[in-house]
């Protein structure tokens, strides 16, 4: 590919990733609107359903969200009664998000979403989905390492 072609939209790896991410979120929307959730709120609740409680810092790392996005999102979920935030008893600087009984009830209501999404994407062969999943996590891991190296070198200049 010559330099002129390198700036064409269809030659960018980032574009189909971006477009697919948007389309996936769009496909989730009707299911999540029925629960009064956004996609980002949904994945935040997924972490709480798995772990019960988590530090806000660790939640942000796991979901690749900064505090500017996470704080208002958690406030909204807390106002709905799905979680409770509190300071750690061992370190006042650490804020812990803990699932509530209402949050557990929400899990039961949301339990049909993964199956519904699988059904909506049933034309996409399972083997392709598994390969894509593996490749995306491989790419994500590589990018995380690369970005950490860049962040480290910026801090040490």
Indicate residue ranges for each PLM-predicted region.
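Short capping segments at the starts of secondary-structure elements
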Residues: 51-55
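Charged, amphipathic alpha-helical coiled-coil/dimerization segments
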Residues: 25, 75-137
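Pre-recognition alpha-helix immediately N-terminal to the DNA-recognition helix
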Residues: 16, 23, 43-46, 105
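The alpha-helix within a helix-turn-helix
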Residues: 60
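Short, locally clustered residues in the helix-turn-helix/winged-helix DNA-binding domain
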Residues: 18, 46-50, 111
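N-terminal leader segment of winged-helix/HTH proteins
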Residues: 1-35
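C-terminal regulatory/oligomerization modules of transcriptional regulators
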Residues: 1-5, 127-157
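Residues within helix-turn-helix
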Residues: 56-57, 68, 75, 95
């Amino acid at each position: 590919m010559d330099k002129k072609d390198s700036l064409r939209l269809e030659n960018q790896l980032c574009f189909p990733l971006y477009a697919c991410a948007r389309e996936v979120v769009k496909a989730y929307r009707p299911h999540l609107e029925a629960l009064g959730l956004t996609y980002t709120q949904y994945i935040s609740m997924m972490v709480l359903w798995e772990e019960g409680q988590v530090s806000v810092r660790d939640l942000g790392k796991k979901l690749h969200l900064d505090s500017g996005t996470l704080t208002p999102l958690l406030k909204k979920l807390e106002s709905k009664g799905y979680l409770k935030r509190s300071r750690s008893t061992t370190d006042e600087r650490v804020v812990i998000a803990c699932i509530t009984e209402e949050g557990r009830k929400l899990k039961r209501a949301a339990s049909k979403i993964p199956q519904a999404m699988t059904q909506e994407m049933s034309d996409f062969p399972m083997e392709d989905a598994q390969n894509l999943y593996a490749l995306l996590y491989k790419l994500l891991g590589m990018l995380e390492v690369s970005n950490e190296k860049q962040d480290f070198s910026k801090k040490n200049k």
